[in-house]
């Protein structure tokens, strides 16, 4: 039962957030919203531990369609970066500000880039494309994400500085157009570079938040060198081109949890695990790659 510690803790964290916001703001929506997301994410991790091949995709579809379709389109909440800046400038700790605080700013201290692999509605679509692994080394234009990040900030700042009316209506259309552009660019890059995750690597501005926080992640993928046969296959099949055999926090191209799932069916040995970063003990199950908390 110890291997189910991670989904249990994940659900507990989201339930704590759900109850706290419900009681603090007096709005039952927060209880239902974060409970649903927590259950969906925990379910995906649980199914993964049970060896279900499409486990991560279950969480992606449950959370991604809910946030894009229900919150974004039906409720007209801009859950993109522009929505975060808008509510932040408005002094309102609701909607996108809470979402970013939980999923992309403070949450990564616990689950790293789990957002990218389990909940992102952009990656949800891109992961259906045929190029699971990159055919070559990373390109040198990852700096584009910083331009996108800055453009998002300046766009919302201009709405306030220029006194533009109907900001929420503008942001709703920005949400629709922005997501359409993200999908178009993501699909184009996937086919152009033969890499489903090209958008994530070079364009997505969210990594500006995720990268520094996930560096200190409580749970992270580590290699048990006593099991590793140094075949190098994990590096070749990892969708985010991570040097999985390097347990250092400074290893190149630190990753999201989806890297584990991209490799799980392709390795000859059970040498890579997800565990608390404070320990390096190998914990092994029946899958080549699996998420299991340490005993210590």
Residue ranges and their predicted role:
Residues 1-246, 255-258, 262-265, 270-295:
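Non-ligating segments of multi-cofactor redox enzymes
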